Amino acid sequence: MAAVVLAACGNRKTSVVITGDIQDGGNRMLRLALVTTDGLSYIDSTNLKNGHFEFKISSDNELVKERENAPMMFQLFLSDNNSLATMAKKGEKLKITAAAEDLTKTYHVSGGEEAVLMQQLDSALTVFVTEANKLYEVYQKNVGNDSIRADIEVHYMKLVTGHRKYLEDFIAAHPDNMACYIAFYQSYNRRNFFDLNNDLDVLKQINANMSKAYPESEYVKTMIHIVEMVESRP
């Protein structure tokens, strides 16, 4: 009996569990994908039960097994255009709540450090986008007014500068967390807040920290390769 109990406990520690509730999700299908450096690998799906769901990713899953104990990125899809991304390590149990209308803008997560930090980044970006959209609406209504347009452009650049400062502070405050990669690559309207060429030293420092914490992570190896490619350019 003791051996059975220990085996069961060991299995729980090496699995990732993601549970939660999606408001107004009904009985829709929810898909789960592992985000790899080669793209998305769908590993499970379930029908919501009055919005509730549960995924248990076993350590026996080949994609999970080969990733040792480094954080893994997962993406939950209600549809191709409505999803949220999160991170988890083996042994973690994430609890997620969200509204079906927009998973990324409304979700809250607990149970994992990387997951919580990713949510903070998503929430900060949502605030930025909301403010940027307000400025754009005013801009559109005053296309012919050069003075107002110039003022809006100044306010927008202050907004961009402020969010970039937030990301810089985030990276400095969490140097050993994989969520720093998410912060570095955060973007709005196809514009990154960090430029790969001008801010390469930031990515190099993240890589240096991550290499110590998770030397075998495919994400880390890919980021190191990206730096090498940029530095090898003539």
Where are these regions (language model features)?
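Sec-dependent bacterial lipoprotein signal peptides
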Residues: 1-7
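A non-transmembrane, solvent-exposed segment enriched in polar/low-complexity residues
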Residues: 9-158, 162-165
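Hydrophobic core/packing positions within alpha-helical solenoid repeats
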Residues: 156, 184-187, 227
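Helix-turn-helix repeat elements of alpha-solenoid scaffolds
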Residues: 157-164, 196-204
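N-proximal helix/coil linker or "cap" segments that precede and/or mark the start of modular domains
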Residues: 202-234
